Amino acid sequence: MQKYTSEARQLLALAIPVILAQVAQTAMGFVDTVMAGGYSATDMAAVAIGTSIWLPAILFGHGLLLALTPVIAQLNGSGRRERIAHQVRQGFWLAGFVSVLVMIVLWNAGYIIRSMHNIDPALADKAVGYLRALLWGAPGYLFFQVARNQCEGLAKTKPGMVMGFLGLLVNIPVNYIFIYGHFGMPELGGIGCGVATAAVYWVMFIAMLSYIKHARSMRDIRNEKGFGKPDSVAMKRLIQLGLPIALALFFEVTLFAVVALLVSPLGIVDVAGHQIALNFSSLMFVLPMSLAAAVTIRVGYRLGQGSTLDAQTAARTGLGVGICMAVVTAIFTVTLRKHIALLYNDNPEVVALAAQLMLLAAVYQISDSIQVIGSGILRGYKDTRSIFFITFTAYWVLGLPSGYILALTDLVVDRMGPAGFWMGFIIGLTSAAVLMMLRMRYLQRQPSAIILQRAAR
């Protein structure tokens, strides 16, 4: 029991800074929305449309680079720290290549935006302008993620938290300058949010790079001179590990976007109630997602040390802590659901629907916690392909079709409206949780030599 208590303390010490960093990132999006809305409703809508395209594109790159964390954690645990610098440099090369692809996609996103049904031309122009300003921040964001993953792989999660709050503090005044045109800058409205956010990502990257260069604990990692050329073997391995994570993230984001589109014809009340419940659920999701990042670090580190039993302890402890957190957030959601909905909207119909959907959200929080921590465990074992197949099957083969049938058809029961899609979420997330656990058990039952051989690749 003592080893689980000790492991839980170490997991929480890693996870809490990640949670706070995520809060800062979420707050940046909130600030952009509020400040753009203060300028005009059209500008706020433009930022919302632009963000809905930016997120899937940049999260694809973000997911690809998540492969660095278990690689670095494993090298650190095995005492091969001299190889970390090379892996980080390959991460920067990969981030550079992906940045170019993301920037090309975002530059041409105007074709998608202008093809939207009945979109106002002025709104479309502002959304395109916002994206074309924001895309210059893509390299800064992805380079920052490489540096952050280096720190997190070395079990240092506080620098990411500090840089997140630094970004938030810089974002507010820079937004103000470019939205309203102060200090000789042009008045750009919502487009100014894109300029400000792009600048903030570069500030965060430069600050993180400065920390890494001056941190005593990383002196041995920056001994090698010169930046070096791309290593095709190392980059191929990073892509093999990262691509399934990137695709899983992409399909998860697009799933919720597709559901939002399917709910939109049902009416204003249904859309508003669905959005409130989804927004609050996303806030609660920060807790297990951050814990999953900590579990990846601990499992990777323990495997690097050559201890499959300690890796199992880290995995089980992470699941136990995650389930306890989910039970607490579920009780909180059920108890205060009406009060939470009232914070978003005071329309009685919207509040009633949002409160009903939050009951379903409370049910799936436990499954969601298990599946996302399970994903973190599998990343620690470097078993990322299964993450993609499980996620795709659970969400797109089981969850979405079930939700569609329950919400919009009479095949099983009378049409349930938005609640049907939320039942689909429960089916999809529960399926993912079960499959993740089965895969984890399969991996852990393999001979230690095979597990360690995979981890060392």
From Swiss-Prot:
<keyword id="KW-1003">Cell membrane</keyword>
<dbReference type="GO" id="GO:0042910">
    <property type="term" value="F:xenobiotic transmembrane transporter activity"/>
</dbReference>
<feature type="transmembrane region" description="Helical">
    <location>
        <begin position="387"/>
        <end position="407"/>
    </location>
</feature>
<dbReference type="InterPro" id="IPR048279">
    <property type="entry name" value="MdtK-like"/>
</dbReference>
<dbReference type="GO" id="GO:0005886">
    <property type="term" value="C:plasma membrane"/>
</dbReference>
<keyword id="KW-0915">Sodium</keyword>
<dbReference type="InterPro" id="IPR050222">
    <property type="entry name" value="MATE_MdtK"/>
</dbReference>
<keyword id="KW-0997">Cell inner membrane</keyword>
<dbReference type="InterPro" id="IPR022913">
    <property type="entry name" value="Multidrug-R_MdtK"/>
</dbReference>
<feature type="transmembrane region" description="Helical">
    <location>
        <begin position="160"/>
        <end position="180"/>
    </location>
</feature>
<feature type="transmembrane region" description="Helical">
    <location>
        <begin position="188"/>
        <end position="208"/>
    </location>
</feature>
<feature type="transmembrane region" description="Helical">
    <location>
        <begin position="53"/>
        <end position="73"/>
    </location>
</feature>
<feature type="transmembrane region" description="Helical">
    <location>
        <begin position="276"/>
        <end position="296"/>
    </location>
</feature>
<keyword id="KW-0406">Ion transport</keyword>
<dbReference type="GO" id="GO:0015297">
    <property type="term" value="F:antiporter activity"/>
</dbReference>
<keyword id="KW-0812">Transmembrane</keyword>
<feature type="transmembrane region" description="Helical">
    <location>
        <begin position="350"/>
        <end position="370"/>
    </location>
</feature>
<comment type="function">
    <text>Multidrug efflux pump that functions probably as a Na(+)/drug antiporter.</text>
</comment>
<keyword id="KW-1133">Transmembrane helix</keyword>
<feature type="transmembrane region" description="Helical">
    <location>
        <begin position="314"/>
        <end position="334"/>
    </location>
</feature>
<keyword id="KW-0813">Transport</keyword>
<feature type="transmembrane region" description="Helical">
    <location>
        <begin position="243"/>
        <end position="263"/>
    </location>
</feature>
<dbReference type="GO" id="GO:0006814">
    <property type="term" value="P:sodium ion transport"/>
</dbReference>
<feature type="transmembrane region" description="Helical">
    <location>
        <begin position="11"/>
        <end position="31"/>
    </location>
</feature>
<keyword id="KW-0739">Sodium transport</keyword>
<dbReference type="Pfam" id="PF01554">
    <property type="entry name" value="MatE"/>
</dbReference>
<feature type="transmembrane region" description="Helical">
    <location>
        <begin position="127"/>
        <end position="147"/>
    </location>
</feature>
<feature type="transmembrane region" description="Helical">
    <location>
        <begin position="93"/>
        <end position="113"/>
    </location>
</feature>
<dbReference type="GO" id="GO:0006855">
    <property type="term" value="P:xenobiotic transmembrane transport"/>
</dbReference>
<comment type="similarity">
    <text>Belongs to the multi antimicrobial extrusion (MATE) (TC 2.A.66.1) family. MdtK subfamily.</text>
</comment>
<protein>
    <recommendedName>
        <fullName>Multidrug resistance protein MdtK</fullName>
    </recommendedName>
</protein>
<keyword id="KW-0050">Antiport</keyword>
<dbReference type="InterPro" id="IPR002528">
    <property type="entry name" value="MATE_fam"/>
</dbReference>
<feature type="transmembrane region" description="Helical">
    <location>
        <begin position="418"/>
        <end position="438"/>
    </location>
</feature>
<keyword id="KW-0472">Membrane</keyword>
